[in-house]
Amino acid sequence: VNLYASHLHRTRIWDLPTRLFHWALVVSVVGLVVTGNIGGSAMIWHFRFGQAVLALLMFRLLWGLVGGHWSRFSNFIVHPMAVLSELRGRGRPEWHTGHSALGSLAVIAFVLVLLAQVGSGLVSDDAIAFAGPLTHLVSSAIVSQASAYHKEVGKLLLIGLVLLHVLAIIWHTFKGRALVGAMVHGDKPLEQVMPASRDGWRQRLLAAIVMVLCVAASAWVFSLAPTF
């Protein structure tokens, strides 16, 4: 009998909506990067992935307010001392239960960079065949600046964050922290009793309603594109 394992508390950390959001975002971001680099007819799918990412971002912002305990922004750890403690391999147990200090900063960075990338994409124009759905609502100067950011700065920032995220997962796996597994089944074995995220049918129904509203809102934004 593994006495250490018998003293661990299996706790629901990531509710199903958060897990589905995470993996849907992974697929959508990879799709964005790949189709954006291919160009040409693949840009049709680039726009579709962009629409999906916009809906997912809106969902995450709302779910960060009403979602499971560890998915809420109020439980993110962004204190500088917590960041320093994690870098030194220290910190309280609760700092590694949900998103750690560095993990919290990574989520915030991802959301901000993706918002900037999607936002700039909405008003970008490749000057060949494809233009964002909102380019007709802003000046040509804004379109030019947004296009430059979207194709150069934003894309590199996004790819850089993705690579850092992958390296962080590898590092945590080496340290014995199964981050990927927890984001699949939702649970973590904890040495101390910690609050569990609610993940019942009520929370999942609420998430479904929020997601439908976000999908509708994203579709509406993209429907503003002029028709010729």
Segments from the language model and where they lie:
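Membrane-embedded alpha-helical bundles that constitute the cytochrome b-like, heme-associated redox core
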Residues: 1-228
